[in-house]
């Protein structure tokens, strides 16, 4: 019986199969996991929070405060339990004028670490800028209890005390001298601190030492020349010294850094009014109102500038809106501004009385003039202007005038008594 012959294996096919299996295995383990499909977005690594913090600091130095705040928010999202990020962001928010948000972030930092001196200090500064001086003073004192060598806290304390001195709201019996001492301590502890130089400049400005104040603000400006507030303060000091061109230049720099803030345009308008350039004053006052159309203070200032430019119809429109409240042409609600001892608000009221008198609306003019006389009897300028409004009305009544149309600079016609078409009573030099 013959044995069946066995078929010999095909070693070539076997080898090929083994190679194919090995190749597929290699691709599965090493090639496919690293392959990037052109149809799938490429994954990017999330930057560490430190990268965002560095970016925020660079943006702050460039004066890009809103972008710096956004960078801190990104760092905060990655590291939500780090109180130092909250504090750093709050400091920038104070410079940016976001005082409520600065207060919130400093308080959030304190929730993470109640004994953080810098968080208490920044909270104090935010409260100070909101006019809450008593709570600000309590917060900064606690910051100094936690760290007596906190230079920023000493600087903020000096500014808080200066505000208390200027508003007469301080509890200390020697507010001014304490503020001076605190500003000097801040500079001793940190001679290269922007906050320390700013605080020292502020107390010098408050005490009328304008040239020394300018030097301190210039020192702050050398540390960072992209801070709006420093340029505003420099401008105010130059204006107080009568250096109006330099004042306008500094206000212009401030406006460039933060065009959304109407403060610089407001101050430029008042500076031009001081030197009698009323057309320019009107231009910048209008720009300020465009930035915040519902602000009665800006509207009142615009009314004063219209009056100074002998544009009574527009002056009365703006002053009435500021003092009585109402709605702007584009539908924004304006809350009436109440008469206080603030020199600018007083100016809005007596200017309103004057323009009412010039337009022979004497019943209203007398009410406003008498209100000014009863509320601010110690303000000599206000008394003079209120009396002038009353005298105009007395002349109007005595002359029995015939209405005469007068066109404003914007082409509007307003019936005005022939007895009151003379040049308006000049206002006092606007208060810095």
Regions found by a protein language model. Name each.
Residues 45-84, 88-98, 129, 166-170, ...:
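Alpha-helical segment of the N-proximal tetratricopeptide repeat
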Residues 57, 91, 125, 159, ...:
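Residue-level recognition of tetratricopeptide repeat
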Residues 78, 112, 146, 189, ...:
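Structural marker of alpha-solenoid helical repeat scaffolds
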Residues 61, 95-96, 129-130, 163-167, ...:
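Register position in tetratricopeptide repeats
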Residues 74-75, 108-109, 142-143, 185-186, ...:
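Canonical positions in the second alpha-helix
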Residues 49, 83-84, 117-118, 151-152, ...:
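Helix-start (N-cap) detector for alpha-helical repeat units in TPR-like alpha-solenoids
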